[in-house]
Amino acid sequence: MTATTQTPRHDWSKDEVLALFEQPFNDLLHQAQTTHRAHFDPNTVQVSTLLSIKTGACPEDCKYCPQSVRYDTGLEREQILAVEEVVAAARRARDAGATRFCMGAAWRSPKDRDLETVEAMVREVKALGLETCLTLGMLRDGQAERLREAGLDYYNHNLDTSEDYYDEIITTRSYQDRLDTLARVRDAGLKTCCGGIIGMGETRQDRAELLRTLASLPVQPQSVPINQLVQVPGTPLHGVEPPDPFEFVRTIAVARILMPASYVRLSAGREQMSDELQALCFLAGANSIFYGDKLLTTGNPEADKDRRLLARLGMGFEAHACAQAEAEDLG
């Protein structure tokens, strides 16, 4: 069996990553769990809440997305929310146990006039003691710096899949466009949230290459969301063959081994997962979830259901970052 990796590497080869995927299932999970325990409390999960601050009418053609203006999914377009609405939602999320509040807008790239409103949202949410994350599309020069100055902690920009398979899913922005935005985010001193989607018709080789690309970035993403495709009627990917559940767990495990110090988020698609599958994902090294009954436009398990599942597993929520810092200061 491959030796457990406890320090991040940026030089994984394709063959090495595929070899991880091809291990016997129990061996792979043992390696992933051992790696996980070297960096995290194995019985806690970090909790984020996601809010759509501007919904629909996106000009991009991502084949999985109900927010694209190109597909008839029945989604109603909504203008950007008022700052007060966002703050109220963030306060509810904090009171429910979330430590990070993520805000998403269906834009190709934010306009400067909209960025002013978003900056105000970030400042107000930060004032509640929450970490902040944004996903607004591609960023131009100087925009990441503005968001950092407003107090932003994380910026999400997923690679979605491997570079080889990417053109089968999206044609309106290139893979390099995504890498360029990630570089701007890193250069501005922000933390990156970057992952992909499983179940879009890709092969194991594509999944391996996606994870290898993420692990090979100059700084590995601090947060790695692994989504299972949520099939939405009207999108081109509706009806695609779903991924094998054990292959999904393998993907979580390999992500944990390749990026040992990153939070691996069990992200979209949990509503369609059994409790048993989610438990296997936690065993494989997932240690972050979205909390709340909606993710942008798709469903998510009810908060009480998540609490019951974690209680059955003897797991709990990660302590709030501010509370942890205070405890360390007192200690």
Curated annotation (Swiss-Prot):
Keywords: 2Fe-2S, 4Fe-4S, Biotin biosynthesis, Iron, Iron-sulfur, Metal-binding, S-adenosyl-L-methionine, Transferase
Gene Ontology MF terms: 2 iron, 2 sulfur cluster binding; 4 iron, 4 sulfur cluster binding; biotin synthase activity; iron ion binding
Catalytic reactions on record: (4R,5S)-dethiobiotin + (sulfur carrier)-SH + 2 reduced [2Fe-2S]-[ferredoxin] + 2 S-adenosyl-L-methionine = (sulfur carrier)-H + biotin + 2 5'-deoxyadenosine + 2 L-methionine + 2 oxidized [2Fe-2S]-[ferredoxin]
Names of required cofactors: [4Fe-4S] cluster; [2Fe-2S] cluster
InterPro entries, sorted: Aldolase_TIM, BATS_dom, Biotin_synth/BioAB, Biotin_synthase, Elp3/MiaA/NifB-like_rSAM, rSAM
Cofactor note: Binds 1 [4Fe-4S] cluster. The cluster is coordinated with 3 cysteines and an exchangeable S-adenosyl-L-methionine. Binds 1 [2Fe-2S] cluster. The cluster is coordinated with 3 cysteines and 1 arginine.
CDD domains: Radical_SAM (cd01335)
Pathway(s) it belongs to: Cofactor biosynthesis; biotin biosynthesis; biotin from 7,8-diaminononanoate: step 2/2
Domain named Radical SAM core: residues: 43-267
Pfam families: BATS, Radical_SAM
Domain of life: Bacteria
The keyword DNA-binding belongs to this UniProt entry's keyword annotation: no
Binding site for [4Fe-4S] cluster: 58, 62, 65
Self-association and partners: Homodimer.
Role description: Catalyzes the conversion of dethiobiotin (DTB) to biotin by the insertion of a sulfur atom into dethiobiotin via a radical-based mechanism.
Membership in a protein family: Belongs to the radical SAM superfamily. Biotin synthase family.
Listed name of the protein: Biotin synthase
